[in-house]
Amino acid sequence: MKMSKMFMPTLKEIPADAEITSHQLMVRSGMIKKMTSGVYNQLPMGLRVFKKIEQIIREELNKKDCQEILCAALLPSELWKESGRWTAMGEEMFRLKDRTEREYCLGPTHEEAFTDIIRQEITSYKQLPLNLYQIQVKYRDERRPRFGVMRTKTFTMKDAYSFDVDDKGLDKSYQDMFDAYVSIFDRCGLENSPVQADSGAIGGSTSAEFMVKSEVGEDEVVFCSGCDYAANVERAESCNLASQKEEMKELEEVHTPGAATIKELEEFLKTSPDKFAKTLVYEADGKTVVVVVRGDREVNEIKVSNAIGSVIEFALATDDVVRKVTNAEVGFAGPIGINADYVFIDKEIVEQRNIVVGANKTEYHIKNANYGRDFEGIVGDFRNVQEGDKCIVCGKPLEIARGVEVGHIFKLGTKYSESMNANFIDKDGKSKPIVMGCYGIGVERTAAAIIEQHNDEKGIIWPLSVAPYHVVIVPANMKNEEQISIAENIYNDLQAMGVEVLLDDRDERIGVKFNDSELIGIPMRITVGKNINEGKVEFKLRHKEDKEIIDIEEINEKVKAEFIRNNVRLG
C-alpha cells in the first residue's frame, strides 16, 4: 500500500478524553475514530489489526475442530425469557420492539441463540460432541463507557459454544479451548495469566479468565508468590487464621456511645479491628441478607449473591431496612438474635474466640461473642482476599495486581439446555440435557491489551503477527528519482514474497515519515537514502534503537529471518 493513497488520520496531540495509553495511541495512529460515547468507527489501520487477531483465533479454533457460523444480532425476547435472562441481564441489554410490538434485543451474548439452533438439530448422542463459534458484534448499554475500546457499547467478540453428552466430555472440550486460548494469546504477543473467575450472569460451575497484567486494568487479580494459584478477586480465597484456643468468656454488653464504625469502635475499646465482627445488611430481590466478616475485612458481594443463587438485584440495605432488621440505628448491627432471611458467616469468624459484635441496640456492643454458642448462620468464604493473605494451595503470601480480561471460558453444564429443552437420546435410549460450555474473546480489547504491553514514548510496537503492515519503506528524498525507483523495486519484491508493505511515497520531510512509522508501530523499516550510491539501505526494527546498513541484496533474507524469529508465516 502506498501511503499517499492511504486514509490514515494521525494526530500529534493526545486526545483530551483518552485516559490510557492504548486509547491514546489507537486514536493518534488513526486506528479508530469516536462516533459517540462508547461507539467507535474502525479505520483501515485498525481494521487490519482486528482482522489479523480474528484470523489467529480462527486458525487455532479450527485446529480443535471448531466450526464457524454466524448468528443474527437481532434476537427475539422469547429465547431470553426461556432461559430466565430477559430480566436478569438488567439495563445493559438493548431492548426494542418491531412495528407489531414484538420484543427483541440486540445480542449482548449468544448462549440462547446457539442453544436454540442445537435443540432443533441435535437429537442423538451420535451427533455429539460439537463446538461452534462465531465472530460477531455484541451490544451492551454500558453505564460508563471508558478507556477507548476496552469498555464500549458495541464490540466484536468471538464466542464459542461446546455441546457434549456428559461432564467428562465437557472437561475435554473445556481443556481444548483452554489450550487454544493459550496459543491464541501467545501468537498475539500477549503475556497473560489464566485465573479462576466468577461466572456472573452467564452462569455455570467453573470459569477462567485470561488476564493481562496492566495498571489500567478494571479487574483486580490475586496471584500467589509461591505457586501457580491465580484468581479474580471476585473468586479468590485465602487461608483462614489458625483456630483460637482460648476459653469462651461470658457475654458482656458494653455501652459504646458514638462508636458506630469499626474505626470509632477501635478507638473506644482500644482493641484492634481483627477482634471485631463487622455485620452488614443487604437486600437481595426483596429478601434481607446479613453478612458477618472480621472487622478488618471487606464483604465479597459476588460470593454472597452466588451463595443465595439467581439474584437479580443485590445491594446494601437502606437505613430503614437496617433499623427493621436490627431494632437499632445504623452502626450497631450484630449476629446475635438478628432477624433476617439469610445470615452468612465468614469462615474466619468461626475460628475466632471472644469477639466484639454489635448488640442490635443503639449505642451498644457485645464483647466475648462466639460462633456456635451465641449465633449461627450459613458458613462460607464471603470476604475479599487482601495482599499478604496466605495462599490456600501452598501457604505463601498472595499478591494483588490489576489486569485486563481478554478472554473468558465457562463450564455451563446444563443451565441453558435444561431451561430451553435442548436434549438428546443417549446410548440407552434415555433423554438427557446436552452439557454445554461457552468461550469468549474480545477482539478490540485484545488489540488494546497488546498496545498496553507493547509501546514506548514514540508509539505502538506491534508484534509481527498482528501488525497492520510488516514493513515500511521510506525514501529519504522524494525528489531523488533513483531513491524512488529503488524503493519501488524493494516494495514490489517484498510484496511478491507475501510481505505486507507500506511505501511512504508522501512528499513529507523524512522526520515526519519516521514519526508516523513509529507511531503506528510497523515492525520493520527500510530507509532508502544516500547509501544507495554504495548499494546499501538502512534497516531498523521498531523494538530496537540500533540501525543496520545492509546491502540491497540482503533485504529479502533479512525480512524472512524476522518472520522465522517471530514464528509468523509468510504470505
UniProtKB/Swiss-Prot annotation:
Stretches of the chain forming a coiled coil according to its record: none
Top EC class of this enzyme: ligase
Superkingdom per UniProt: Bacteria
Keywords assigned: Aminoacyl-tRNA synthetase, ATP-binding, Cytoplasm, Ligase, Nucleotide-binding, Protein biosynthesis
Record's GO cellular component terms: cytosol
EC number: 6.1.1.15
Entry domain remark: Consists of three domains: the N-terminal catalytic domain, the editing domain and the C-terminal anticodon-binding domain.
Quaternary data: Homodimer.
Protein's name in the database: Proline--tRNA ligase 1
Species annotation: Clostridioides difficile (strain 630)
Gene that produces this protein: proS1
